[in-house]
Amino acid sequence: MSNYWLNIYKPRGISSAKLVSIVKTILGKVKIGHAGTLDVEAEGVLPLAVGEATKLVQILIDAKKSYIFTVQFGKQTDSGDYAGKVIATKDYIPYKEEAYAVCSKFIGNITQIPPVFSALKVNGVRTYKLARVGTAVELKPRNITIYDLKCLNFDEKNATATYYTECSKGTYIRTLAEDLALSLQSLGFVIELRRTQVGIFKEKNAIRIKSSDAIIKNSLEEKSIKIEAILDDILVLDATDQQAQQIKYGQKCLFNYEKDINLLWVRYKGVVLAIGSLNKSCFNSLRVLNLTQ
């Protein structure tokens, strides 16, 4: 089985699940997962994990992400983007200087209430399904981190502003846009959203799929990224034959390393064997990969 990453560019108008289905059709019978859903109305980087790489998806889900988004001021929609219904309007449109200056207020650790039109679940039901039938949904605030936020452009004529942000996992850009507008004494919703980076995966290197024809299978595999590429900034320990056997069979495994580590990976014969944590020199595996004999 092939085990690698693909840096795929999701176009606007297609769901993340549909894009995964297209890639499955191209590659054949392989296991594929993605590192973080993009809304149908959004576009951009969608890393796909193939084969054993699916066991490392959570690392990318936890990674920093970057977006470029455009806010339409003066209106609010029920979904937070252009696909929703307008539910409120406000005459005040912020000045250019205000649109630029407001960014500093949001950089750092902040709280955010997720939009009801999201894939979150309440009592086992997706909140967007509840919202569509008019069921009241109350979601709790979440802690997120905005590492960078800056205004790239302000269009006074169309009452829009385009922003760039680098943020932590769990950040909803639609909510960020609404909160930006509210902070500027206005209302706002997202009219364009593009994810430009997820961890090591960047927009400039992303593959744009124009056909589901199996003829492009070789082209995709040629652009594949090694499974260990996302582990470059994580501590690695090399396992002996005995340690490798212990890890494979879920047995206690000790390493000659004294510091406690929340996340590291173990390499055996040059390939990824497992990811896990280290507590008092004892390795606790989170996921074990089947890449070695």
From Swiss-Prot:
Keyword annotations from UniProtKB, A to Z: Isomerase, tRNA processing
Enzyme Commission designation: 5.4.99.25
Active-site residues from the entry: 39 (nucleophile)
Pfam family, one: TruB_N
One GO BP annotation of this record: mRNA pseudouridine synthesis
KW Isomerase (keyword) present: yes
Gene3D superfamilies to which the protein is assigned, alphabetical: Pseudouridine synthase
MF terms (GO), sorted A to Z: RNA binding; tRNA pseudouridine(55) synthase activity
CDD domains: PseudoU_synth_EcTruB
Catalytic activity of the protein: uridine(55) in tRNA = pseudouridine(55) in tRNA
Function as written in the Swiss-Prot or TrEMBL entry: Responsible for synthesis of pseudouridine from uracil-55 in the psi GC loop of transfer RNAs.
NCBIfam families noted in UniProt: TruB
Family: Belongs to the pseudouridine synthase TruB family. Type 1 subfamily.
Alphabetized HAMAP family for the sequence: TruB_bact
Protein known as: tRNA pseudouridine synthase B
Species annotation: Rickettsia canadensis (strain McKiel)
Lineage: Bacteria, Pseudomonadati, Pseudomonadota, Alphaproteobacteria, Rickettsiales
